[in-house]
């Protein structure tokens, strides 16, 4: 009887839950004011910040021309993530990193991060009477690992009430097989005022 029940559940896909349970989230925070700062060499180069992350994986921030770049892990200048940002002015000087961890093996392996960015929208820019304040918010999913560190996808955090779930879905279903510089980045859910990055052939 148990075998028959198990077979029926397997046919219905109800035994796939343990696979999902083998992925968990770990959260860390950073604040550029408390991180090691290296000054930039030019006026529009604001420098870089090395911040603590998860275990031996660091959070590296870089900023210039009112835009930011973020990568994770051992610092590498050639990480594709260090050239990926949003078209509009943006910042992420502090925040909470959600690390997606694969626990199916002997050692837990972080394979993606999710981080909320602040982005200036066209309305922010047009209606500003002083320093521009950003009201746009987007979740950025970044892949980790030997295949490179790069953006996998984006979710407009204000246009989608389930933004966190959408971002986790991008991470869990795509990050581990995503080919940096080859695969198209994913935009999931509705898009409001935030201008999303575009791949060259789109």
Question: Model-found features: residue ranges?
Answer:
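Sequence contexts marking disulfide-bonded cysteines in secreted/extracellular proteins
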Residues: 34-36, 50-52, 149-151, 173, ...
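C-terminal partner/receptor-binding element of secreted or periplasmic proteins
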Residues: 156-202
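Intrinsically disordered, low-complexity linkers and terminal tails enriched in Pro/Gly
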Residues: 16-17, 131, 200-202
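Loop-to-helix "switch" segment enriched in basic
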Residues: 8
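Sequence termini and other peripheral, non-core segments
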Residues: 11-12
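Charge-rich, low-complexity N-terminal segments
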Residues: 2-5, 15-87
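Short helix/strand-capping turn motifs
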Residues: 86-161, 165
């Amino acid at each position: 009887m148990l075998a028959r029940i198990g077979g029926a559940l397997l046919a219905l896909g109800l035994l796939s839950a343990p696979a999902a349970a083998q992925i968990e989230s770990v959260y860390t925070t950073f604040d550029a004011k408390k991180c090691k700062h290296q000054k930039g060499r030019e006026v529009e180069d604001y420098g870089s910040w090395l911040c603590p992350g998860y275990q031996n994986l660091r959070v590296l921030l870089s900023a210039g021309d009112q835009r930011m770049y973020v990568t994770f892990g051992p610092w590498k200048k050639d990480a594709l993530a260090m050239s990926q940002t949003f078209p509009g002015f943006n910042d992420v000087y502090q925040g909470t990193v959600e690390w997606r961890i694969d626990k199916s093996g002997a050692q837990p392996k972080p394979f993606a991060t999710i981080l909320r960015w602040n982005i200036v929208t066209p309305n922010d820019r047009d209606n500003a009477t002083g320093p521009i304040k950003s009201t746009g918010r987007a979740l950025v999913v970044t892949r980790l690992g030997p295949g490179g560190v790069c953006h996998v996808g984006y979710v407009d955090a204000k246009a989608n009430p389930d933004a966190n779930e959408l971002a986790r879905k991008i991470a869990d279903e795509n990050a581990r097989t995503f080919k940096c510089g080859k695969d198209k980045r994913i935009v999931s859910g509705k898009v409001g005022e935030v201008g999303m990055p575009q791949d060259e052939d789109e």
